[in-house]
Design a protein with these regions (language model features):
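Short acidic/polar mixed-charge low-complexity motifs
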Residues: 3-5, 19-20, 135
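Extended Lys/Arg-rich, glycine-bearing segments that form polyanion-binding/interaction patches
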Residues: 10-11, 19-21
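An extended, acidic
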Residues: 22-144
Length: 144
């Protein structure tokens, strides 16, 4: 968006503009900056838990780019990104999810198992990427 560079390899280190970074340590929803893709048309079950969750988040946002918002979780600019609708293709999000995992963040696929993703198939995904397991588990506690 503004010339920032986010890089990683499989050594568990994520660089933001050349500096080593880690996800945020915030573990209270009311203090968290959480991005949510609000497109929930035709998803009645998902609407219920999302509305309950949004009541607990002080700073819900949506920038319009799942990859950027997921990458922001890895570098500590955001505490979580929630993609409720399974409409992201592998190449839309896999790089950013790699950043979150490399940085020590938390990822939960909502419609698939992350270990069974076949990059050659045209699957679509929904997921929660969080800065830590505490925030991730709090978010998932709203999903029934």
């Amino acid at each position: 968006v503004n010339g920032d560079r986010i890089l990683s390899n499989d050594n568990g280190k994520v660089l933001f503009n050349g500096n080593s970074v880690k996800p945020s340590s915030t573990n209270i929803l009311d203090d968290a900056y959480i991005s949510v893709n609000m497109r929930i048309r035709d998803m009645d079950n998902e609407k219920k838990w999302l509305i309950s969750l949004l009541r607990e988040i002080r700073y819900p946002r949506f920038l319009g780019s799942a990859a950027l918002e997921t990458a922001y979780v890895a570098v500590g600019k955001s505490n979580a990104f929630i993609q409720i609708i399974p409409n992201l293709r592998t190449f839309d999000c896999i790089g950013a999810l790699f950043l979150v995992k490399s940085a020590g963040g938390w990822i939960e696929f909502l419609n698939n198992d992350i270990d069974n993703v076949d990059l050659r198939k045209p699957e679509r995904f929904s997921y929660v990427a969080a800065s830590n397991s505490t925030i991730g588990d709090l978010i998932m506690s709203f999903r029934t």
